[in-house]
Amino acid sequence: MTVKHLIVCYDVEKTKDRNKVIKVLEYYGLIRVQYSVFMGSLTETRLHQMNARIKREFTKPSIKILVIEVCNACMERALLVHEELPKVNRQFEVI
C-alpha cells in the first residue's frame, strides 16, 4: 500500500467555507502547520477520496485549494522554522 505525503494550501474568503475546508482536512488526519497550510500522509485510496470530496463540496470559485503530493526525499529535507515538523502520519487501510 502506497502512502502519499501531502501539503494542502487554501485561500478561502468566508469563515463558514474556511471552517468547512479545515474540518475536511482534519477528518483525513492532516495537521495544520500554518494558518492556511496542512500536511500529512494518506494512502492512495484515502487521497483519491479526499480529492473527490474536495472537488464535490467546494465548487465556489472563491474557494481555492491546492493539494501537492510530496516525495519521500522532499519530506525528509523539509524544514519548518521555529517549530518541529509533525511526524509523518502513516495510515494503513484494513481491507
Swiss-Prot record:
Coiled-coil ranges (or none): none
An example Gene Ontology molecular-function term: RNA endonuclease activity
GO BP annotations listed: defense response to virus; maintenance of CRISPR repeat elements
Enzyme Commission no: 3.1.-.-
Needed cofactors: Mg(2+)
UniProt-listed Gene3D superfamilies: 3.30.70.240
Binding site for Mg(2+): D11
CDD domains in the record: Cas2_I_II_III (cd09725)
Annotated keywords: Antiviral defense, Endonuclease, Hydrolase, Magnesium, Metal-binding, Nuclease
Uppermost EC category: hydrolase
Oligomer status and interactors: Homodimer, forms a heterotetramer with a Cas1 homodimer.
Function, in words: CRISPR (clustered regularly interspaced short palindromic repeat), is an adaptive immune system that provides protection against mobile genetic elements (viruses, transposable elements and conjugative plasmids). CRISPR clusters contain sequences complementary to antecedent mobile elements and target invading nucleic acids. CRISPR clusters are transcribed and processed into CRISPR RNA (crRNA). Functions as a ssRNA-specific endoribonuclease. Involved in the integration of spacer DNA into the CRISPR cassette.
Similarity remark: Belongs to the CRISPR-associated endoribonuclease Cas2 protein family.
Protein name: CRISPR-associated endoribonuclease Cas2 1
Source organism: Methanospirillum hungatei JF-1 (strain ATCC 27890 / DSM 864 / NBRC 100397 / JF-1)
